[in-house]
Amino acid sequence: MLKSKIHRATITDACIDYEGSITIDKNLMQAANLLPYEQVHVVNVNNGTRLETYVIEGPAGSGQICLNGAAARMGMKGDKVIILGYSLITEEDTLTHQPNLVYVDSLNRITKVKNGVASRNLEV
């Protein structure tokens, strides 16, 4: 199940020579309930790529979103990304589970934090 989402963060750097991962501002990690070394999916809004990596903690308040290692080939400074964390939960907990959603501005400052995803009623 979706546990955490940082919506439309801006990549601040891409470091190809680093070992690998995504560096995320500690404040964003805490708001989204992401832990160091936790596996995440990163969806690049600009080019449509989707990658799987793990989180390392960046300085609190820095706004840092940095793709590292091979992941740096999947995005560039200025690209918008959606960062998704998942968790396993019991079937019983699926009835009440709500993910942590973090919305940011162009400098990766938190603008809103909420739980749950709005449903859309699609008429056929």
Curated annotation (Swiss-Prot):
Cofactor(s) the protein needs: pyruvate
UniProt EC number: 4.1.1.11
Compartments, record wording: Cytoplasm
PTM-bearing positions, type Pyruvic acid (Ser): S21
The protein's enzyme class: lyase
Molecular function as annotated in GO: aspartate 1-decarboxylase activity
Record: active site: S21, Y54
PTM (free text): Is synthesized initially as an inactive proenzyme, which is activated by self-cleavage at a specific serine bond to produce a beta-subunit with a hydroxyl group at its C-terminus and an alpha-subunit with a pyruvoyl group at its N-terminus.
Pfam families in the record: Asp_decarbox
Residues the record lists as binding substrate: T53, G69, A70, A71
Entry keywords, A to Z: Autocatalytic cleavage, Cytoplasm, Decarboxylase, Lyase, Pantothenate biosynthesis, Pyruvate, Schiff base, Zymogen
Catalytic activity: L-aspartate + H(+) = beta-alanine + CO2
Pathway info: Cofactor biosynthesis; (R)-pantothenate biosynthesis; beta-alanine from L-aspartate: step 1/1
Gene Ontology cellular component annotations, sorted alphabetically: cytosol
PANTHER family cross-referenced by the UniProt entry: ASPARTATE 1-DECARBOXYLASE
Function of the molecule: Catalyzes the pyruvoyl-dependent decarboxylation of aspartate to produce beta-alanine.
Family, as annotated: Belongs to the PanD family.
Subunit (UniProt): Heterooctamer of four alpha and four beta subunits.
Listed name of the protein: Aspartate 1-decarboxylase
Originating gene: panD
